[in-house]
Amino acid sequence: LYEIIGQDRAIKALQFGLDIKEEGFNLYVAGMPGTGKKTAIVTYLEQKAKEMSVPSDWCYVYNFEDGQKPNALQLPAGMGSQLVADMARFIEEMKKALKASFESDDYASRREETLKGFEDKKQELMNELNQKAQDAGFVIQRSQIGMVIIPVINGQLINEEQFSILPQSIREEIQDRRKALSDEMRTAFRQFRDIDREAEADVEKFNKEVASFAMDALLDGLNDKYGEVVECKLYLGAVREDILENLGAILGAQKPPENPLAAMMGGGVPDPTRRYKVNLVVDNSKLEGAPVIMEQNPGHDRVFGTTEKEARFGALVTDYTMIRGGSAHMANGGFLILPIEDLARNPGTYEALKRTLLNKKLEIEELAARMGYVSTRSLRPEPIPFDCKVIIVGDGRYYYMLYQGDPEFKKIFKVKAEFNSTMERTQENVEQYAQFMCNLANKEGLKHLEQTGIASVVEYSSRLASDQDKLSTQFATVSDIIREANYYAESNGSEYITEDHV
């Protein structure tokens, strides 16, 4: 159970394939069912993995330049979960700090003071315009459709009917003066708009200063902790800029919803701070060494991840927080073991595996979209670099089918380790067989075998091998015999498993 017995050639091939770093030296481990190759390989890899370094954590974060292409963020093992918690805490503290700052009396008075200067400028312009209108014999009045220029004759406002009965020469002279005043008024209104834009820019600048003061202390703590990771520092800088550009939405989202029912049903205005969350897809915080992942159900999404969706008002929606990694993500930096029989039932997984190994990149892509069944636009997460030894385990017949029928297979699975169904019946191998029986008893809490029991199992193994000079390596079958013998030993109240029980 703890070492590979009687498979010297397979061990050498396994060691070679695992140690060589060049491209394409992944392994196909062939052998009959029941030879214990899966268990032996996992045990062997787990021992080797302990000597290797723990790989990085991986997160997906919002891409502020293109929301459809989430960015992948690499962090030292254990820091991914910390960043998730720290950003969640930052979001809540940031919202509270902004709310307190923008609802303070000091902010209100300083904003009013800033705006008053611009209102004074506009009033001064309006006074000048009114004076020009008065000098030209007009009054400017505000109506429902805008500003209206009304003529004044002998101190009286003249309406359209009165204007129409004036002599033509007087009407023409009034129209000339009105046109000149209209030009003056258009110029003044352009100045009004310029003042409004200047006021808006000044208020926006002031708001950013207030927001920066409120949240920079929070961000400084994050930068101190994660600043050595360049991508993380850039991400935190992008978060800061996005908050400053979306202050109105962030502050507005904290107000009670206008439609409580829609909010309860998941509708209404989306939370603008959701995109500052961090989605941890690979968490290696609990690893001690490299990962060893045995994927028994190698469906496409289970191996290569997926983007989940949720229903909102009858429509399926998704975002980067719903990206889920697969077993290939979990095994990245270590070892991924796939059974060929199950892989053969999932051709989409096999094709994706080849692309991943050839491109050295992990891409999360919907299988339906890849095959053209779905035309709607979906997320395209940034690929993650893939550095992993892939070990396919299964019948040798599949190996030859793939080797002869798939030109790409031989480029990416260059090492074959074959587990023989028999081994020589040497004294050393018999002793290893006895050690195997002892380990099985210890692991499963079975009774130990005395010498006659061990001898009987060895003889049974030779019968399985159909050769007195050989021993069978079908350890699954041999293990079942020992388990059955243990039942009879317990039934008879025997302390050990004997020849009779076997």
What are these regions (language model features)?
Residues L1-V502:
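Non-catalytic accessory segments flanking P-loop/AAA+ NTPase cores
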